[in-house]
Amino acid sequence: MENTETLPLISIIVPVYNVKNYLEKCLQSICGQTYKNLEIILIDDGSSDGSGELCDLFAQRDGRIKVIHQTNAGQSADRNRGLAVAQGELLGFVDSDD
């Protein structure tokens, strides 16, 4: 496979709100993709079920993951916040319960 520096950076924005039961599988799927030049932006929208802590744990394991914690503002605000920090040439959204 090509060096990731020659491939375009893809930003993946994942809104997260109380999805602890699904989040690990979602993040394993994203992190396990064969395309490696990814920026994974997790927007924790004030989760109270441990989802935010799980986001932090994954960020410690994988340097491509950025976590933003905020008070609950809704999925549209999460997506907009992710767009504001995304640096990729290409962009995608993944729902955390996918």
Where are these regions (language model features)?
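The conserved acidic donor/metal-binding loop of glycosyltransferases
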Residues: 95-98
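Local beta-strand N-terminus motif with an aromatic residue
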Residues: 9-10, 38, 88
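N-proximal low-complexity "stem/linker" segments adjacent to membrane-targeting elements
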Residues: 1-32
